[in-house]
Amino acid sequence: MARIVAANDDDSMELNTISSIHDSTLGQLLKNVSDVRKMAIGDETPVHESLNQDYNDGYMRTVPFVLSFDNLTYNVSVRPKLDFRNLFPRRRTEDPEIAQTARPKTKTLLNNISGETRDGEIMAVLGASGSGKSTLIDALANRIAKGSLKGTVKLNGETLQSRMLKVISAYVMQDDLLFPMLTVEETLMFAAEFRLPRSLPKSKKKLRVQALIDQLGIRNAAKTIIGDEGHRGISGGERRRVSIGIDIIHDPILLFLDEPTSGLDSTSAFMVVKVLKRIAQSGSIVIMSIHQPSHRVLGLLDRLIFLSRGHTVYSGSPASLPRFFTEFGSPIPENENRTEFALDLIRELEGSAGGTRGLIEFNKKWQEMKKQSNRQPPLTPPSSPYPNLTLKEAIAASISRGKLVSGGESVAHGGATTNTTTLAVPAFANPMWIEIKTLSKRSMLNSRRQPELFGIRIASVVITGFILATVFWRLDNSPKGVQERLGFFAFAMSTMFYTCADALPVFLQERYIFMRETAYNAYRRSSYVLSHAIVSFPSLIFLSVAFAATTYWAVGLDGGLTGLLFYCLIILASFWSGSSFVTFLSGVVPSVMLGYTIVVAILAYFLLFSGFFINRNRIPDYWIWFHYMSLVKYPYEAVLQNEFSDATKCFVRGVQIFDNTPLGELPEVMKLKLLGTVSKSLGVTISSTTCLTTGSDILRQQGVVQLSKWNCLFITVAFGFFFRILFYFTLLLGSKNKRR
């Protein structure tokens, strides 16, 4: 797909756009956007007033927040490598060396990390790969399971609860996980629908998105699709800013970012950090990991923490770096990038015999000296119009001043002399039906712009139906016709499930988007499951009708219109249960390749135990449970009953009894003589027109006697709901997005 806005590649134009708004806070930017729109369309209601934001001469006086963390320690168990010697228990116990190497080892990823930062600041965590940067960000963002992380994380001196943190914070992952066929504006609008409350009118949500687009400096790319390998879209720097915009749409108090400048050139990286600086100035605490900032990026940072193999080797402002390393004995040259010099020195020390132990100890002494000399006192909120507020009251006051649009509802209390607020913190910004509606709309919009995906599915169903129709063309009611009908039904019903395997990559492609959005309560997991089912169902109806119309009359199936209706219903139920089963597996398997392997294997077992290859009465007792778990069994038995339920219809008459046997090759005269001999032996008159096998007899021969066709239909549908419920629990248990 051609790029919609050709000017998006002009980074200098974007940089000028950013420079033009310079250090405007979000509140100022909203006001500017409102004024422009008011002049253009005569709107008399400023955006900042519409969002209930209180400004004084364009500047929002934010409520102060201080985030502190003390003695954060995180250890993980490292399993020993598989060794041939470890496979023998006797040798492992006899050889102390082998026994020692076989025991799991503990690796320390964070070792007593402490620090603090406040609103209006950007704190950057630096270090080489494996130093613990991302681990520290995860620890502060509550992405490490309780019990695994030691230490405390506090906001304004109060321990942060998990539910509260989800509401007031946002986390931007290192990878840009976006829907490729949505435009930038649509992507941010859907984020606004999720994170902003229903009480905010849609018109004001749109203005919020437009203001954010201007703040991010991506106005020229607003109508451009995100793009992927097959569709040209926005640039890497723009994708990164869109990813940030998704998570700051509700103006969070805490913003965590994992290497937001990774993979970007110096200009794009500077523009991204420039955006983060304005976010911080709007009253947020911004904490990010960064690999190697340029000189310009360093000028935007307020606090630095250097890590080396889980230890703090420096904590302080960028301005204090030269003095720190001078006192350590390694002065930074004048024209040298401070952070590059520090990182290079740390790498050299890590490769030396003593490691960074000396630098770690020096940092501890240096921090103590600064505290004793009172040069760096602990951060405390400055004087503000909100003294002595609890954390919830401070958050409520911050909401009333314009922060955290979806974070809660501040409720004023008090009389003439008091102006305190309390906070009602909702777990989610919107009710479930709004979430389902928004999720469904987004999924359908993304799918509608990729019609080739549905086209491939319906083409495969129609082609398969056409092949079956030509192979099993107009089957008669002879014994051969009965046998061919059984083969057609077995293959047709299994085809429904194999076709559903195409749905496997859908959730696997969306998995990390889902994990990012649900990690901070953008929507409920149950809403996603219901939306997923709602969006997929219409396509299943089209597939069912297409297959039924292609095969029903061509094969010569019986039952008339009522038989056709049931045939369509059981095919639809098969598609439903098959897609639900594949959807459940997509929540379990880690990759598409493994998923396809498992789906093909399990569906083969379902077909084996369906009753076509081996009668139910012949299945061993230790495998009979698989017969009842087979998804192919119930649709197969249902279509058999739909075809052979007429007890008056005959399928074997007179000499046809010899068909499908060696005697079937005899001349008709010989068959009649044999039939007469059999009649005399049995004492029953059997003529050439005597009906010997009806549809009911065929059902009994196939062992289809336990359930009616409607019961089989209901069980097939129930299997679909069962696997959707299992899918929900896999999301609930498997998408905690936390380290163990």
From Swiss-Prot:
Residues 82-334 form the ABC transporter domain. It comes from the Eukaryota. Keywords: ATP-binding, Membrane, Nucleotide-binding, Transmembrane, Transmembrane helix, Transport. It is found in: Membrane. Residues 434-644 form the ABC transmembrane type-2 domain. It is a multi-pass membrane protein. InterPro entries: AAA+_ATPase (IPR003593), ABC2_TM (IPR013525), ABC_transporter-like_ATP-bd (IPR003439), ABC_transporter-like_CS (IPR017871), ABCG_transporters (IPR050352), P-loop_NTPase (IPR027417). Belongs to the ABC transporter superfamily. ABCG family. Eye pigment precursor importer (TC 3.A.1.204) subfamily. This is ABC transporter G family member 1. It comes from Arabidopsis thaliana.
